[in-house]
Amino acid sequence: MAPSTLICDTDSWQNLKTHVAEIKKTHLRDLMSDADRCKSMMVEFDGLLLDYSRQNATHDTMSKLFQLAEASHLKDKINQMFNGEHINSTENRSVLHVALRASRDAVINGDGKNVVPDVWQVLDKIRDFSEKIRSGSWVGVTGKPLTNVVAVGIGGSFLGPLFVHTALQTESEAAECAKGRQLRFLANVDPIDVAKNISGLNPETTLVVVVSKTFTTAETMLNARTLREWISSALGPAAVAKHMVAVSTNLTLVEKFGIDPKNAFAFWDWVGGRYSVCSAVGVLPLSLQYGFPIVEKFLKGASSIDQHFHSAPLEKNLPVLLGLLSLWNVSFLGHPARAILPYCQALEKFAPHIQQVSMESNGKGVSIDGVVLPFEAGEIDFGEPGTNGQHSFYQLIHQGRVIPCDFIGIAKSQQPVYLKGEVVSNHDELMSNFFAQPDALAYGKTQEELQKENISPHLVPHKTFTGNRPSLSLLLPSLTAYNVGQLLAIYEHRVAVEGFVWGINSFDQWGVELGKSLANQVRKQLHASRTNGEAVKGFNFSTTTVMAKYLQETSDVPAELPTKLP
């Protein structure tokens, strides 16, 4: 396929478009009655079981999707990523987050150099530093151990590490390693977030990790300056060097900020923010909380999926299957949204993280060559742990819009609870819903079935479920650090597969720039209005009116800002 050719112009794409009419004649009630079909749509790898039999798909559908993958040169693109080629073409960068969790003896080249030794140099530095903090050999300026960590970052510097932290908090081995310690994440520039994160913390026992590649991210640096003031006002300016460290590549600005450059932990241009949880961005705060050995298990889990993604045939490749099925639902069946439904409270921050990974990666309107797409790429991701979501938005999923669902279940609970006299354990009660919901969506309930139950005729339309609503189920054996790493990598690569087939660049994010540049203009106006009383000007009528109202309501804010902390 020539570089300028869009995937929608290929025979494979057109064959799938034609195939849609055939699929719309089917119903999952009938498709699910074919045991051979269902068996062929189950894939196991390293303890994980994927069941995609409840997708609106037949053997022919899958064959055509694999042909589409071939037409898009999916295997070649996967190899290009692992080989360090500059597949992020708009920024002329490699995409090598797989190197972040590679084994020490692996060889992964970027710009003609094996990057794995550099990765492990940083990992070893994190191991040593986190052990010093956790053992108490590195103490704060007053001699007290640093038992509290506040990680300051935003976007990928926050959502990924928070997901992993939340997933590990209730895992027995990780929880034991974290006893007596706290890890918090400060992301929002809203001062309320600052107040919440320092509430109850003692500066004497707190270490702040500032995460910013360039050390210029506006929100992160304002929050960092706020916490620097919180520390220095309590302990003196010299305390900053003992109580603040950085994850950054801009050592000049790190030192200017007051942090010893020796306490800066590097990452690289080939690591995108939303793919950075396995870099120092996530590994440092997580190692401070749980110890490096726990985090290393997480990295090994991710690495196992990396190797599977790179080497498994498409028909047995978990991320490839998930990516192709998402693309089938979005681009052919017309379902733009996806619900991520983990039946595990420890995964409550998983959907928000994948929301960023997916929507920032694939929310693009042009091809990698800059050609406007005649189809919509990307999907709208949202989710909530089960069973909470059942009492929130499942009504729409069952009887409103068709939204493909990912059900994620854990065989062994992190916190098993049994009550004498109960029919099942608490976890079995949870998993009863995990198994029931996909079938409810697939089969639905017909008017005939309701009439046999003697339902009042006027209620029959309201209690009818059309069914034929697609989902897939992913069952993990447990939720250890290793399994968390597996889950992360599956979804990272799933997103890449979609982008590779759509022919877009999943590794840039120019869409976040325009709003930031406009915010700079607003910031200047607010400053001028506060200090000089200048009227709001240079904006459209609506913005001018609302900004003037805002300034009026906050006229008590002093022109020269004194220091005021929560």
UniProtKB/Swiss-Prot annotation:
EC number: 5.3.1.9
Signal peptide extent: none
Entry GO terms, CC: cytosol
EC class (word): isomerase
Keywords: Cytoplasm, Gluconeogenesis, Glycolysis, Isomerase
Subunit structure: Homodimer.
Family: Belongs to the GPI family.
The protein, known as: Glucose-6-phosphate isomerase, cytosolic
